[in-house]
């Protein structure tokens, strides 16, 4: 059990085992706050900085899945599939710091009335509480973008400011895609990533 735990810490970059020397702790990695290679819910990241997170400009809609989204979520293609789109701006105190669009199949809600759900809560909490689905891992793609004009306005960006766009497919414990997320981050966040040479 201890050997497995050490192996996991080594995979995550916290430890390095060196033959003839022993096990070394990489203190720089231990002190990293927002690791892009570890999925952290953005409310937690904002609280860790000492700010209070909240969502506003919240929009929840039902939309028919495009062929691309149906493929990403591995939905049946023999009939139109309805998706739930949750769009929101997230604030840190009074500063707009990101805009997210979360997309879930309506079927995950098992005929539950959407009107009774507080969609201002973190999407992973909503998936766990109302869909009985735990997200365990994501596949993410990163892009530096200028972003759509409407989102730039909501985030109060200066003309020269870029956004970090994170596109994710989120998987359940059964390795099934259950959620697509597209998030535009401002430079409020300082992300780090631990990369190992292969």
Residue map of PLM features:
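N-terminal helix-turn-helix
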Residues: 1-25
